[in-house]
Amino acid sequence: MSCKLKVKGQYIKDLSFENPNSPQIFLMISKTPPEINISINVSSVSLPVKAQDQSSEQPSDNKVEPLYEVTLQVNAEARVGTTVAFICEIKYCGVFSIESDDVSIEELSQQDIRDVLLISAPTILFPFVRELISRVTSTGGFPPLMLDIVDFRAMYESQMKQGVGQNDNSQDPEK
C-alpha cells in the first residue's frame, strides 16, 4: 500500500532553553566537555475538521480530507558532572493529510496510517528540529548541538517490539 503525506503546515508548538549555571558553566565546559543526553518522542493526533473548515481547493464532493498533527519532541540535556550546562526542549509539529494512489483514505489500514504518521512525518520534520536546536544552543553560548540523523523506522519498530508504542491517537481525536 502506497501512502503519501501532504504537508499542510508546520510550526514550533513549544521551545525552551535553560542555561541555569551561566556564566560559571562556560569555564567548566572549557575544561571538561559536557555529557549530552537526548530523548526523542513522536506522537500524532487526528484533527477534528469539518467540511466547511477546509480550503476551496477541496473537491466539491463534500468529502472531508482527514488532517493529522504530528509532534516531534526532542529533549536535550547537557551536564558537566552533576552540574546542568543547558536544557533544550522542543515540540515541533506538522499538520499532514494522507493520500493514496491505490485506495481511498477510508480503505487504508490503521497500520498504514500509523506507519506514515510515525515514520514518514517525523522524517520530514526532523531537519527543521535539528537546525532549531543547533541555533538555540549556539545562541545560548554553547557550541551548536548537531543531532545525529534519526532512523524513525528503526525507532518505531523497536518500540513496537518492546510493546511500548508511541503516543498515537491518530484515529481518535478524543484521546
From Swiss-Prot:
SUPFAM superfamilies, per database record: SecB-like
Any one of the GO BP annotations: protein transport
DNA-binding as UniProt keyword: no
Pfam families in the cross-refs: SecB
Key word Chaperone present: yes
A GO molecular function held by the record: unfolded protein binding
Signal sequence region: none
One GO cellular component, as annotated: cytoplasm
Location of this chain's protein in the cell: Cytoplasm
Keywords carried by this UniProt record: Chaperone, Cytoplasm, Protein transport, Translocation, Transport
Function: One of the proteins required for the normal export of preproteins out of the cell cytoplasm. It is a molecular chaperone that binds to a subset of precursor proteins, maintaining them in a translocation-competent state. It also specifically binds to its receptor SecA.
Entries under NCBIfam families matching the protein: PRK05751.1-3 (NF004392), secB (TIGR00809)
Family: Belongs to the SecB family.
Subunit and interaction comment: Homotetramer, a dimer of dimers. One homotetramer interacts with 1 SecA dimer.
Name under which the protein is recorded: Protein-export protein SecB
Source species: Ehrlichia chaffeensis (strain ATCC CRL-10679 / Arkansas)
Organism classification: Bacteria, Pseudomonadati, Pseudomonadota, Alphaproteobacteria, Rickettsiales
Gene behind the chain: secB
